[in-house]
Amino acid sequence: MANKTVLFNKHLESNAKMVDFHGWDMPLNYGSQIEEHHAVRQDAGMFDVSHMTVVDVTGTDACAFLRKLLANDVAKLKVPGKALYGGMLDDNAGIIDDLITYYLTDTFYRVVVNSATREKDLAWIAKQSQGFDVTVTERPELAMIAVQGPNAKAKAAAVFSSEQNAAIEGMKPFFGKQAGSLFIATTGYTGEVGYEIIVPETEAEALWQALLDQGVKPCGLGARDTLRLEAGMNLYGLDMDETINPLAANMGWTIAWEPTDRDFIGRKALEALRDAGTDKLVGLVMEEKGVLRHDMPVFFTDAAGVEQQGVITSGTFSPTLGYSIAMARVPNSIGDTAEVEMRKKRVAVRVVAPNFVRNGKQAF
């Protein structure tokens, strides 16, 4: 029996096509994935992300524990509400999950992890917390709605109370704040501005309906995937997993190497990988007809004249750009051109940074 979010009936009311997503019944689209994609790039769309796992870490050792658990360093978070993105690694520097951590007080952090990895994440966090004065509390009674797009903040403001709007006024990107019953964060998975709103399940349907009434378009997993890929954002299980280290997943920027005495889990293995050199995650652009897809092989000739091979991790047609884009894991020696094998022939592609669209505009 699949899990259903508290918004399941609202999806059916909007004629959603429901699919299984890691054991959850989730909307794939509400009629047109392309229209939903464009709504987020040009106006405002919303996603039910209540399947995500919210975990509160509290206690006198909360900071020390998270400094061990995560490759990024929560000690950098000085202002209440500030968040950071990073990887939770195993001893071999494989990525157990990627997650966002909010600093609320010195003894209270909120962590949002992926739904597909929920059970192994919770088990790993519980195991690693032994010996620390912390309490790890999953918050299944909380739902989450992401409102994204150039008009998302204005449309959400019409739904929030005057007190909530005052509480979040001027909030910078990558912050979260408790405003009444809502935890409102300036985060997202689309490359657009907007909010991710953590809401009690008892209030989620009313919030969804209020946003609908403001003209916010409901969007499904299909648009969520094309939007995140245009934005160059990794999807766990495709672009990285426990066999991949963050240096090979375009997550090097999320590793806090300093201070050198912070012994986070996976550090020694990661230092060895850094010194030896790893593959890297790049962007591919193909302006010919056709669509780049997961697992297609990528070929290029390096400076020494040797043919090298990589693989596409995520690929799609980009509705914003009008042609196909992909992320690919390739040897570090790649230049700015390559070939992808599709339908038994090789097609030329451009190699770019894995960031295709930001705030509705081409980013490369």
Curated annotation (Swiss-Prot):
Membrane spanning residue stretches: none
InterPro entries per record: GCS_T, GCS_T_bac, GCST_C, GCV_T_N, GcvT/YgfZ/DmdA, GcvT/YgfZ_C, TrmE/GcvT_dom1
Chain coiled-coil ranges: none
Signal peptide coordinates: none
Pfam family name, one: GCV_T_C
Reaction it catalyzes: N(6)-[(R)-S(8)-aminomethyldihydrolipoyl]-L-lysyl-[protein] + (6S)-5,6,7,8-tetrahydrofolate = N(6)-[(R)-dihydrolipoyl]-L-lysyl-[protein] + (6R)-5,10-methylene-5,6,7,8-tetrahydrofolate + NH4(+)
A GO-annotated cellular component: glycine cleavage complex
Source organism superkingdom: Bacteria
Record-listed E.C. numbers: 2.1.2.10
Alphabetized UniProt keyword annotations: Aminotransferase, Transferase
GO molecular function term, any single one: transaminase activity
One GO BP annotation of this record: glycine decarboxylation via glycine cleavage system
PANTHER family: AMINOMETHYLTRANSFERASE (PTHR43757), AMINOMETHYLTRANSFERASE, MITOCHONDRIAL (PTHR43757:SF2)
Similarity section: Belongs to the GcvT family.
Purpose: The glycine cleavage system catalyzes the degradation of glycine.
Assembly and interaction partners: The glycine cleavage system is composed of four proteins: P, T, L and H.
Name this protein carries in UniProt: Aminomethyltransferase
Lineage, broadest ranks: Bacteria, Pseudomonadati, Pseudomonadota, Gammaproteobacteria, Alteromonadales
